[in-house]
Each structure stands twice: as structure tokens, then as C-alpha cells.
């Protein structure tokens, strides 16, 4: 019946883990199929895979599946498995006893809660239970009760695809074949035939077509359609090849699940090919396709958006797809599209503080808030929904016009570490979970006291597209600033991919730039920047110390990262090459502790410019070759006869200690180096 209707359904088995698994085994023996089993514990001989490896299933298909959530619920893995199952499939979801489930520790919370032990996740579990019970197409079998008897409503028989393009696919293929240059971005929900269409394009194209994506396994469906005409490349390997060879004879580059590839890498690849087809999922395990359109595609000069709406792997109104969408809020990133700013000059915009307890009592608020975040940040995934609903230390504000959410702000508590632990973070010896900015200021900017202070980091901020450029984000931030100050916090912070536009925005909000990383972020292709808004005297002192350190060090940092000087820094024209107290502390941390070279780079550069006698007494070949002569680590390792990079780092530290001893008696060091051994 289900196969005839083209539908898939969910059966929830709730009870003890052993009972649930035994029922799943029994049912799998009664129904022939592939029976993909996702969980940390699966029966011997099962076609099983752990939740953390579920992405390897992408691009594949199977009949029937089991998802074991008795110990923890990995929502991304559940979404992946649901997308893999074809028409006629049952998905068996194994969960703890129904009434106990929300109270039990969830092992998956270790991935996103920033806690040292699993926590219970009552808000998300109650939300999920509510969706499961509300669906007439979900069957619940609880231990100690009789199994449900599935009742299927009469529906017309489904006509599965016969291998030829659907009307929708054919129209898109014709459009693609007529194109001479540009980038086409194909978005669709799972099961709509994106990969199949890409394979058809390869099969019909007269020229060479190359394929790339986050993993070769994910292109299985595409390859089946394209045969041996599609050559697969890993993204980084393809870029390296393009940089060294002529690829002008390649007509098409096909990028599967493009939103999963770092934007800088994707941009670099597109420059080498006249035509490119990028496919990405509208909503799912990797994030949102709509956000991908807003963020990445807006940077392209010649791109075209195309979409597939009709499913081909199952029939329309599929029960399994609908319940997964309801649980993950996959359909809620469009809910703000109809909000018009007409009359906004007189519209009353209210800033509302939201707590996690509000999400269950006001499901519409949750849908609007999370939907807005999903549409604005294309790497928003189901993991973020789990964190938003149950992770400790989360704070939220919503900008509302009447009952509509037009702005969303998400903040995370940071700091409060013990002094000894903060020193260990500074020394490079410890890196506990959480406190992203606070720990980074200690580990990379020398501000060891940052993790001790109480702070709150802005994690996400989003404003509905039609309501932007009206100061709504600044209103929300100002409200949270007052709230945090009233609670006795020391500072607010933010981490962002550095662009002039974003730097100016945060500066206008009162934040001061205090750190710029030495490497570009994979997600944004920009250097990671951090800014602080002080709220207390201690926060003022930290902010000023970190800002002045960045200004003083900028001469050497800029040579390392090649970034234009931020307008808010105003560094001196000539670098300060004297060694001050902060430099000696930094050098001691590098020489006698485990601070990374990148964090100590300006102090090391100053060290190398000291007394000329130092060059005779301590030539420091490893440091000089790397910092002054621009040699690669591989070249230095070979030149000095070292065993590898680890030995080179040890050599760097030894040379730093040697130079310090020559310039300043060890007994007079400002830092007791014994603390760092």
C-alpha cells in the first residue's frame, strides 16, 4: 500500500533500549529491505553506521531504516536517514520510555551544549513529542502496550519516475543547455532530483564536465546518471589542479551540496570555469539553501536561480518528510518573507526578551525566531535548534512589529573561569569547552584575565530582509547591552568574519576591535575578527589593553595576514621595536609554556631586532629563517636536519629561551617561568 501511494512513514518505538531494539530486529526480519541502521549500538551483521558518520549516506538510497535515539538524538543524522529512504519505506525511531525521555541525559548534547557531561534536553524533546503526537501519520508503540494497527487513508496510486526527465527537469535542462556562461544555482528540498538532473546534464552535454562536492559518496546518484563522463574531484584537489593547469576545455563544473564547501574555496573554483551548476538543499543537515542564496550568491556577478519543487523519490505530501520538517522547523525560513515595511516610519518596534522556557509556551515565536535565523545564516543546522532550545547560558531578544518577529538576537554566556584555569588557557595548556572569545583573547592576544571576567557573546543577529537598514539590529544590541550591564557583566563580545562593512557596523554599535586572526575562516573566507563592548571598569581595562596591543602589534600582523588596516586602529607609522613587560610575558609563554607562535609573533619579531650582539651570541637560525626570511617550515626542517614540524616548534622555543637569557638574566624575568613548565 505505501509503495503504491509513494509514501514513507514513521513508527516510534518507545521503551527500554533492549526492548526497542528487539522489536526493530523483529520487524526488519518481517519486511524485506535494505534496513539502514543508524545508531551507536546496532545488531551484529546489521547494515549499520554511527550517527556522526551519517553524512556518508548522502546521495544513496535505501528501503527501510532504523534510527536508534535511545541514548541520544543526533538531529542531523535523523534528517539524513529520512532523506535517504525511498518510497514505501518505514523509518523506525527508537526512543526511551515516553514519560522519561525528556528527563534523561542526551549523549548527543556533548556536541553542542559546551558542557563536560551530557544534559537532559526537555524543551526540544517536548517539542518533538508534541509534533509526533499531533501527526495522524505517525505511529507510536510504547513498551507494555499493544502495537498500533496502521490505518492508511485512500490515496491515488503514485507514478514513480521512469528514468526520463520530468516536465520540471526537462524545462531546466533546456535552460541550462542554452546557457553560454554564468553560474546556475539549483535549490530544492531532498528527494526532488537535484543530483539526477545534474547527471542528466552531464549525459546530454557535448563537452567535458567535472564534478566536485563535500564527498564522492554523496555524488552516487549523479554518477549513475552520468556514467563515466563525469570526473569527480575533491574541492581542494581541484583548486590545486586548476592553479597549475589549463582547464579551459572543461564546459561545466557541477558542485553538489555547494553550501557545504567553504565559500572562499568555492569562489576560487568558479573563476576557472565558464559555466557552473551549484546544487544545494533548501533545508537540511548542512544548513539552508535560502541563506546560501542570500549570502554567497549575492557576491556573484552573473548567476541564475532555479528550483525543483515536485518530489521524484516519493509522492507529494509524504508523511515522513512532513514530520521531519515539523520537528526540525525546516519549513519556517519563509515565514518572514511577507512582512512588509510599509508604514514602518510609524510602526512601533518592540524589543522582547526571550527565554528558553518561552519556546514551548509560544511555538509561533519559536518558528518565527528560528526561521529568521535560518534565512539569514545559511549554516544554521538542526544542531543550532538543539542548542537554542536547551543549551545552558543562552539569551535571546526579538524585535517585533505587532505579533511578527522582524529581528532576532542570540547571545551566549562566557567567562567566569577560575584564575588558575585562565592562566592555563593563556599558557596553551588547557582549552575547556565554551567561552570562544574570552578564551581566544587569553590564548592568542595575551589577555589572560579575559576568561575570568563575566561576559556575553553575540552568536547570531538577523533582521528580516524588508526591515533592514532601519536600525533594528542596533536597537536589539543596545537593549541587551543595558540588560547585561544591569546583571553586572563586564563586557559584550562578538566574533565575525572581517569585512569593512561588518567592522563599521560593530564599531557603530559601540564595539572595539581587539583581535584579528592569522588564518581565514573556512565558512566565510574572511579573517576571524573579535570585538568587545566594555560594561564595567574591569571590562574597560581589558578592552583598552587588548585594543592597544592590537594597534602596537599591527605592523607585524599585517605582514602575516595581508589585510588593509582597519579604520578604527590608527597604528603608528613606525613600529615599536622595544620589548615591554607584555612582550617579556609573551616571550616567556612561548619559550617555557605552550603558547603558539602565531600568538607570540610580534614579540618574537621584536626579539629578533634587539642588540646586534644577539646575532653573534645567539644567531637563532630557525626563528630568523621563518620570521625574517620567509622560509617555509618544510624548507627549514630540511635545512636544519630536523625530524619534522614538531621538532621545529621545539627548536623555536629553545631559541627564544636562549635569546631571552642573553638579553635579560633569567632571575629578572617578569614572569616566573617555573609556572609554565
UniProtKB/Swiss-Prot annotation:
Listed binding positions for ATP are: 169, 191-200, 313
**One record GO biological process:** tRNA wobble cytosine modification
Q: What is its EC number?
A: 2.3.1.193
Which positions bind acetyl-CoA? 461-463, 501
Chain's gene name: tmcA
User: What's the protein name?
Assistant: tRNA(Met) cytidine acetyltransferase TmcA
Keywords in UniProt for this one?
Acyltransferase, ATP-binding, Cytoplasm, Nucleotide-binding, RNA-binding, Transferase, tRNA processing, tRNA-binding
- Family under the similarity heading: Belongs to the RNA cytidine acetyltransferase family. TmcA subfamily.
Q: Reaction catalysed by this chain?
A: cytidine(34) in elongator tRNA(Met) + acetyl-CoA + ATP + H2O = N(4)-acetylcytidine(34) in elongator tRNA(Met) + ADP + phosphate + CoA + H(+)
Which cellular component appears as one GO term in the record? cytoplasm
User: In which domain of life is the source organism classified?
Assistant: Bacteria
Localisation per UniProt entry: Cytoplasm
Q: Which organism is it from?
A: Yersinia enterocolitica serotype O:8 / biotype 1B (strain NCTC 13174 / 8081)
List the Gene Ontology MF annotations in alphabetical order: 18S rRNA cytidine N-acetyltransferase activity; ATP binding; tRNA binding; tRNA N4-acetyltransferase activity
InterPro entries tied to this protein: Acyl_CoA_acyltransferase, GNAT_dom, NAT10/TcmA_helicase, P-loop_NTPase, TmcA/NAT10/Kre33, TmcA_C_sf, TmcA_tRNA_bind, tRNA_acetyltr_TmcA
Q: Which Gene3D superfamilies match?
A: 3.40.50.11040, 3.40.630.30, P-loop containing nucleotide triphosphate hydrolases, tRNA(Met) cytidine acetyltransferase, tail domain
Q: What does this protein do?
A: Catalyzes the formation of N(4)-acetylcytidine (ac(4)C) at the wobble position of tRNA(Met), by using acetyl-CoA as an acetyl donor and ATP (or GTP).
Enumerate the spans annotated as N-acetyltransferase domain: 351-533
